[in-house]
Amino acid sequence: SIIDIGGESTRPGADFVDRFSELNRVSPVVDGMANLGIISIDTRKADIARAGILKGAKIFNDVSSLSFDPRSLNVLAETGASVCLMHASGDPQTMQVNPTYDNVLLDVYDFLSLKVKLCLDAGIDISKISIDPGIGFGKTLEHNLLLIRGLSLFHGIGCPILLGVSRKRFIGEIGKAQ
């Protein structure tokens, strides 16, 4: 199992957390749990990822797919950590404001393919990369259902697929939509 530790909520509408506060939140938790299993550091910030990895985290779980902080790719290359690249349209404050796609499956696939290529070009081995289509992040109920139905498409990228399942509001909306 993987223990994912983060100090900044990335749910839609969440407020930004400064680096100092985020580091103070995650450092003692990573310290206390590093020996309990595989630790993932859930952050968009390169310095928080580096600190977590140096304390024992093995995975950099970045909901921005290395887009938020330009130093993130260097942290991966320098530390040898694994990465989970997630698709999210916009940032937590704006991602649910009228999310639109030409074709959600192909748009998310193309985005993640480009991010994987970016990592490969930086020397990160494909065995260190996983992808997450970002269910609930900048997507409508219809988008989420299309992504779940078409999940097998993402195997074409050549990386393991991870899905975050915490607090998925759309699950409750499915019953209302039927």
List each model region and its residues:
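Catalytic domains of carbohydrate-active enzymes, especially glycoside hydrolases
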Residues: 1-6
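Active-site-adjacent loop and "lid" segments of alpha/beta metabolic enzymes
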Residues: 10-39, 43-47, 53-54, 58-118, ...
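Short acidic capping loops at alpha-helix termini that bridge into adjacent secondary structure
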Residues: 126-128
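Active-site metal-binding loops of divalent metal-dependent hydrolases
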Residues: 135
